[in-house]
Amino acid sequence: MNRAHRLVVALSISAGSLATGLLAAVPAASDTFPSRPITIVVPYSPGGPTDAAARVVGERMSAVLGQSVVIENVTGGGSTIATGRVVHAEPDGHTILIHQLAIAANVSLLKLPYDTEKGLTGIGLVNYSPMVLVGRKTLPADGMAEMTAWMKRTGPGVKFAHAGSGSLAHLCAALLAQSVGVTVNMIPYRGGTPALTDILAGHADIYCSSPATAIEQIKADMIKAFSVTARERMPALPDVPSAVALGYKDLDIQFWQALFAPAGTPAPVVDRLNQALRVALTDPKVLKSFADSGMSAFGADALAPATASAKLHDEIKRWAEVIHANKIEAAQ
């Protein structure tokens, strides 16, 4: 090796060593995260299930991450203002979103100023609950088979209550009517409570309710409960059968919630948030809070960030088909 060649090799080695040293001096994103308080953006007002989940989960995640977790309720625009804020936030993990099934339905219901799937990445699924199909006490049917047979006989005379155009209760009602092959009279209400009130009063026939809204009335035998929209029975309603087990395969319907970060958030940061979420979802206080509102935590096998992203993708596709087939429009 001549002198010039030896000099080039030596300089290359020195430059490589310097670069390695500089890279080693730069801490990985996961080593410095979080460097300030984390904001969980909630698209709904305080007091609802999404806000409640954000607060109890955020408190436990704060202890794991060693930084404060701030809950910020950003309402309006059918939850699009909050979602858009996180989509356009700095992708560093310090501003994240908690949302529920509506984030998937909104893709087909609204003209969005962002691309939901391209703008967000999953951190992890949080909790879920099936719906429960209930009816007025005087409905001449006991059990799903009799109820759906009555729907076929009655047709447009069926007064099917729901909690507002585009709500999960509406989507559930549309999917049931579609699977039974009948056209019914869909009656919108401003939320679940007034819908259930009219079921109790006998002014409406059937309603697809959240368990938390109807469980006390079911246990008091004030209304009929035909099935839960799940593969298995609910522990809180052990006497109410599973719609899927009864043969209604399409009626596997979950109200679910998940955490999302802006697209482009470094994988180590997403993983750090996911690890904190996993710890939170094993905390007895968190689990009790969920149970008190009729919710269950997702199991450990469903908690990977990719699973949350896949859930969003699948739900967007599923509800797009129902919304378009039934010409459902968002509430004005």
Which residues are covered by each model-predicted region?
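Short beta-strand->loop
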Residues: D115-V126, A161, T183-I187, D205-I206, ...
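N-terminal (or domain-start) structured segment
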Residues: A25-K118, G157-K159, S165, G181-I206, ...
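Short, low-complexity disordered leader/linker segments with a strong preference
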Residues: M1-S35, A145, A331-Q332
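Short secondary-structure boundary segments
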Residues: Q100-L101, K137, P211-A212, A230, ...
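Hinge/capping helix and adjacent helix->loop/strand transition within the periplasmic-binding protein
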Residues: M61, H88-H94, V107-P194, A243-A245, ...
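An extracytoplasmic/periplasmic, membrane-proximal ligand-sensing/linker region
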Residues: S35-P37, A267-Q332
